[in-house]
Amino acid sequence: MLLIPAIDLKDGQCVRLKQGDMDQATIFSEDPAAMARKWVDLGARRLHLVDLNGAFAGKPKNLEAIEAILDEVGDEIPVQLGGGIRSLETIEKYLDAGLSYVIIGTAAVKDPGFLQDACTAFAGSIIVGLDAKDGKVATDGWSKLTGHEVIDLAQKFEDYGVESIVYTDIGRDGMLQGINIEATVKLAQAVGIPVIASGGLSNLVDIENLCEVEEQGVEGVICGRAIYSGDLDFAAAQKRADELNGELDNA
């Protein structure tokens, strides 16, 4: 089970939002590269970056901070990024800079042809971010709820060749209310590609519950507010996940 720390970038700083509201941003660090180093030193095996300004602007807005993070840890672990990815040129720029994966969200829903082109051009590097509330997909920084069913879209995107899906329950994100395990497993069972859970992770019990369903296709979980607020000890949580999955050498 991959525990993936999230570094949400707004105006070059590391912040956390409540339910995607840019006006409810808590600044946790003014040095995102140092924050990336901290999580890697604590045992992170992948990082999840979000360009929040980019998500709302539709183009990269935190390049300097992203490049600083990649300079710091990009040679050590895979780094994925979402937010504002609307063109093949942007994807190419990010992958050339050292990102392992880019996450396409709104554009995948609104312009499936773009997603198909991206999967063809950058096979193995494209993750789709599906944000949902009550099973319906949301777009545009969660501000618009569509009529699309999550599972229908996920199956279509799997056919396009996406590498995995980051599934966010937007009713829970940033609220420390617990992961929506049921909805995440339902999605994972409906597709043959890995699903990464997101939204609401609050404590060690969530990690233990996720480890129980890893074999259903839930590859990892994005760790946000809980690891910044101190509700979840990241290093201890990754160790516990490894113990549960038999990934620690007992010798």
Swiss-Prot record:
The lineage of its organism: Bacteria, Pseudomonadati, Pseudomonadota, Betaproteobacteria, Burkholderiales. GO terms for cellular component: cytoplasm. The keyword Ribonucleoprotein does not apply. Pathway: Amino-acid biosynthesis; L-histidine biosynthesis; L-histidine from 5-phospho-alpha-D-ribose 1-diphosphate: step 4/9. Its main location: cytoplasm. It comes from the Bacteria. The keyword Cytoplasm applies. It catalyses: 1-(5-phospho-beta-D-ribosyl)-5-[(5-phospho-beta-D-ribosylamino)methylideneamino]imidazole-4-carboxamide = 5-[(5-phospho-1-deoxy-D-ribulos-1-ylimino)methylamino]-1-(5-phospho-beta-D-ribosyl)imidazole-4-carboxamide. One of its GO terms (biological process) is L-tryptophan biosynthetic process. Keywords: Amino-acid biosynthesis, Cytoplasm, Histidine biosynthesis, Isomerase. InterPro entries: Aldolase_TIM, His_biosynth, HisA_bact_arch, Isoase_HisA-like, Isoase_HisA-like_bact, RibuloseP-bd_barrel. Its EC number is 5.3.1.16. It is an enzyme of class 5 (isomerase). It is found in: Cytoplasm. GO terms for molecular function: 1-(5-phosphoribosyl)-5-[(5-phosphoribosylamino)methylideneamino]imidazole-4-carboxamide isomerase activity. Pfam families: His_biosynth. The active site is at D8 (proton acceptor), D131 (proton donor). Belongs to the HisA/HisF family. This is 1-(5-phosphoribosyl)-5-[(5-phosphoribosylamino)methylideneamino] imidazole-4-carboxamide isomerase. It comes from Burkholderia lata (strain ATCC 17760 / DSM 23089 / LMG 22485 / NCIMB 9086 / R18194 / 383). PANTHER family: 1-(5-PHOSPHORIBOSYL)-5-[(5-PHOSPHORIBOSYLAMINO)METHYLIDENEAMINO] IMIDAZOLE-4-CARBOXAMIDE ISOMERASE.
